[in-house]
Amino acid sequence: MTNFQDKPNIRIMFDSLAPTYDKINKILSLGLHLTWNHSFVSLLGRSDHLLDLCAGTGHVALSYIQKYPQASATLVDFSTKMLENVQECHPLAPFSYVISDVTSMPLPNDTFHLASMAYGLRNLSSPLEALKEVHRVLKPKGRLGILELTRPATYNPVHLLHKLYLNLVVPSVGRFYSGNSYAYSYLKESIRNLPCDTSLERVFHKSGLHIIRKRKLLFGTATIWILEK
């Protein structure tokens, strides 16, 4: 797992990306991240309240309340600017906000039935510590859904194309639209350094969360896991 010891610098990076984050993600994913988000929300299932971790600009939480209009959400992110972006763009959304690292959340034990984490796992300095913290705040039989960008298997015909896309297209597009080539080189490296499924799933198990469902998207370029406490 990519281990970035200097959290303040990573936080500053995400703060700087907030104004252009959604636009660039749409371009880089060719709009597929919206489809993936909808698939993710469908697999999460219904709950009155969603704990959205590494919430960013709130796309998963917004998709969730569109599907389940009676629901509300708590958005957790360590980037103040990302959460401010959600508040400014969606002031009437039924959201509460917590500025916090996922590894140490100011939330009580055994509180939430359902949590989500989209595109955040690879950014965690200590995935096991973060997942143990999620385990702490989930109620018994509570669920965590994870959606993450992953690498196709080396035997997959898409593997080489995906590698070229990460190495050439992602940093160039990120630099053009945000002026921050480092941030999108970081994105490339974070995907490349994400452990294989077996290693990740061992971490899930150690945290006390158990896989009840798994789905590969677009030849393995993204993966959804549904975990249960």
Curated annotation (Swiss-Prot):
It comes from Chlamydia muridarum (strain MoPn / Nigg). The gene is menG. InterPro entries: SAM-dependent_MTases_sf, UbiE/COQ5_MeTrFase, UbiE/COQ5_MeTrFase_CS. Keywords: Menaquinone biosynthesis, Methyltransferase, S-adenosyl-L-methionine, Transferase. GO terms for molecular function: demethylmenaquinone methyltransferase activity. This is Demethylmenaquinone methyltransferase. Gene3D superfamilies: Vaccinia Virus protein VP39. Its EC number is 2.1.1.163. Methyltransferase required for the conversion of demethylmenaquinol (DMKH2) to menaquinol (MKH2). Pathway: Quinol/quinone metabolism; menaquinone biosynthesis; menaquinol from 1,4-dihydroxy-2-naphthoate: step 2/2. One of its GO terms (biological process) is methylation. Pfam families: Ubie_methyltran. S-adenosyl-L-methionine binds at residues 57, 77, 101-102. Belongs to the class I-like SAM-binding methyltransferase superfamily. MenG/UbiE family. It catalyses: a 2-demethylmenaquinol + S-adenosyl-L-methionine = a menaquinol + S-adenosyl-L-homocysteine + H(+).
